[in-house]
Amino acid sequence: MEPFCPLLLASFSLSLARAGQGNDTTPTESNWTSTTAGPPDPGASQPLLTWLLLPLLLLLFLLAAYFFRFRKQRKAVVSSNDKKMPNGILEEQEQQRVMLLSRSPSGPKKFFPIPVEHLEEEIRVRSADDCKRFREEFNSLPSGHIQGTFELANKEENREKNRYPNILPNDHCRVILSQVDGIPCSDYINASYIDGYKEKNKFIAAQGPKQETVNDFWRMVWEQRSATIVMLTNLKERKEEKCYQYWPDQGCWTYGNIRVCVEDCVVLVDYTIRKFCIHPQLPDSCKAPRLVSQLHFTSWPDFGVPFTPIGMLKFLKKVKTLNPSHAGPIVVHCSAGVGRTGTFIVIDAMMDMIHSEQKVDVFEFVSRIRNQRPQMVQTDVQYTFIYQALLEYYLYGDTELDVSSLERHLQTLHSTATHFDKIGLEEEFRKLTNVRIMKENMRTGNLPANMKKARVIQIIPYDFNRVILSMKRGQEFTDYINASFIDGYRQKDYFMATQGPLAHTVEDFWRMVWEWKSHTIVMLTEVQEREQDKCYQYWPTEGSVTHGDITIEIKSDTLSEAISVRDFLVTFKQPLARQEEQVRMVRQFHFHGWPEVGIPAEGKGMIDLIAAVQKQQQQTGNHPITVHCSAGAGRTGTFIALSNILERVKAEGLLDVFQAVKSLRLQRPHMVQTLEQYEFCYKVVQDFIDIFSDYANFK
């Protein structure tokens, strides 16, 4: 809104005056009546009109000034230089600022702690009406801006050190660096001390370093004796820089006076662990180097929150495990240092509260840490995610095991308290069957044209991770195949779980293998079992066969114990294209060790199959592995679960069969379909440990 126009104000005043003159019944007019004809003397009425109009003019002027100032503030917030996304949607930190301006002035509401036994019901109530109660609770939080001053953060020398102009540390909780001689305000960094559940200053919440502040960031890590950095953003999201890369990819680099050397880097599906050795490079420094672990959570999507809290809970446990008890505050940062950072800190604190008091008080804790750093937990979606993570933790607990305790755990799972109780294994599997099948996310598979492509209509892919084929020109629905991307232990979308091809979907199957550059096919069914078709034979016994634009030629077929290994030369050529034919070798591992009924008698065959597939992947590159049985869920899920579980056993000496299977069921319905298959997962792991424990460092 532009400044209130004086001409407009004058025009409005004149209208008021004319309205007053035109009213014949007013006392003012009657005072001017006279026995003499003619108009009244205008000079005589001026003092009275002036007294009437002055208050109106003053009121209008004050209103104009107020609206101009309000509009200016809103413009400053919304424009915020280049902090808009290309489509005009405001970034999270800007959404929060605008939202705070429109907050209801009514008094604060009170939200009480929730006993954990009531947590599921409370979340159900709050989630009704599109999470209306969650939004109400979130909008009742204090912003944190009122409780502190921001003088240091707003100093001219420090403004360029702030990534976002409206995300600043309070003066009373900011991290203070040692002053560098001759450099004013060199004690400033955009970072705040944040309490844990009961531990004061357990965390430092910081913005993602800018190029100009990397030296300060490492100075803070050294001076605060921090041993753990938690990173919750990617370097770029939506093509916008969220954090400057403040570490070397390899070797050493010096940031200011701190030398940082890479010691190790382990990439997992949800996060990456980097280990650095840091050491000050001052002439008179004789301090010993320190080891700093950076845990970088890479599964936070560009929009919203993670689809499931499982990955975050695993990540948080790893942070707790790696952080030494004697170390300084854990440094936590995202981009602004409030949204994802606050979410992580609140989940950690509330998990501790569950252990201590068997209840959670999310509202009170978020209110408290917003006094230390404004806007912690930035959106209602993040606020809701906290509750979802806490419910996941309460319902399923910590099911992770060290390999040395597996045998004892299996004994517990096979025991019962009374004859009427289910054994622990059945109860564990029952919890898995409670994982909700999200039918609302199966719209594509449920289209009539695509339902004809399903072997089992209950087992179709979710829309969010279905394998998408290129659309054939002029042919609708040809981008669909009943197949789902499934995460591996170290890599997202490492597997393509699919059904055994039908006669009319063989071409789609080979198109998928070709387009997604899959060099490995794992087949876990026979073509026929119990006189029923389970899978169309999609390869030639000899010579070659063509499906659409793809020709498959068999080059070799060898049987080793229970596994047939077939090598195919796959050729792709579009009939009307002038380009040369493209060829690729694809290897199929056909496992014959699965009986028609039940599960394999021992686990060695499955262990050998997984090892052979991994060796093939190392030679051909880590493109997706195509895995199928008949419906693409039971045996397929068991193979993928065991691949991920055994990979973790080898890498960490840890396993979590329950969460491994639960994660698969969130990606494709009915994965690991029966109690027998679930128990088989435990059996194979035990066999693996027994076979390799003599020369592997498991125990």
From Swiss-Prot:
Keywords per UniProt: Cell membrane, Cytoplasm, Glycoprotein, Hydrolase, Membrane, Phosphoprotein, Protein phosphatase, Repeat, Signal, Transmembrane, Transmembrane helix
Catalytic residues as annotated in Swiss-Prot or TrEMBL: C334, C629
Top-level EC class: hydrolase
Listed EC numbers: 3.1.3.48
Biased composition (Low complexity): 20-36
Keyword Transcription regulation: no
Domain of life: Eukaryota
GO annotation, cellular component aspect: cytoplasm; nucleus; plasma membrane
Molecular functions (GO terms): identical protein binding; protein tyrosine phosphatase activity
Residues on Cytoplasmic side: 69-699
Signal peptide: 1-19
Parts of the chain on the Extracellular side: 20-45
GO terms under biological process: cell surface receptor protein tyrosine phosphatase signaling pathway; negative regulation of insulin receptor signaling pathway; regulation of mast cell activation
Modified residues (Phosphotyrosine): Y695
Post-translational modifications reported in the UniProt record: A catalytically active cytoplasmic form (p65) is produced by proteolytic cleavage of either isoform 1, isoform 2 or isoform 3.
Catalytic activity: O-phospho-L-tyrosyl-[protein] + H2O = L-tyrosyl-[protein] + phosphate
Binding site for substrate: D302, C334, S335, A336, G337, V338, G339, R340, Q378
Tissue specificity annotation: Isoform 2 is expressed in the spleen and thymus (at protein level). Detected in fibroblasts, myeloid cells, macrophages, and T-cells but not in B-cell lines. Isoform 1 and isoform 2 are expressed predominantly in the brain, testes, and lungs, with lower levels present in lymph nodes, thymus, spleen, heart and mammary glands. Isoform 1 is expressed in osteoclasts and not in osteoblasts and its expression is related to osteoclast differentiation. It is also expressed in the erythrocytes. Isoform 2 is strongly expressed in skeletal muscle and L6 skeletal muscle cell line.
Subunit structure: Monomer. Isoform 2: Homodimer. Can form oligomers. Dimerization is increased by oxidative stress and decreased by EGFR. Isoform 2 interacts with GRB2.
Function as written in the Swiss-Prot or TrEMBL entry: Isoform 1 and isoform 2 act as a negative regulator of FceRI-mediated signal transduction leading to cytokine production and degranulation, most likely by acting at the level of SYK to affect downstream events such as phosphorylation of SLP76 and LAT and mobilization of Ca(2+).
This protein's domain notes: The tyrosine-protein phosphatase 2 domain (D2) mediates dimerization. The extreme N- and C- termini of the D2 domain act to inhibit dimerization and removal of these sequences increases dimerization and inhibits enzyme activity.
Protein name in UniProt: Receptor-type tyrosine-protein phosphatase epsilon
Naturally occurring in which organism (per UniProt): Mus musculus
Name of the coding gene: Ptpre
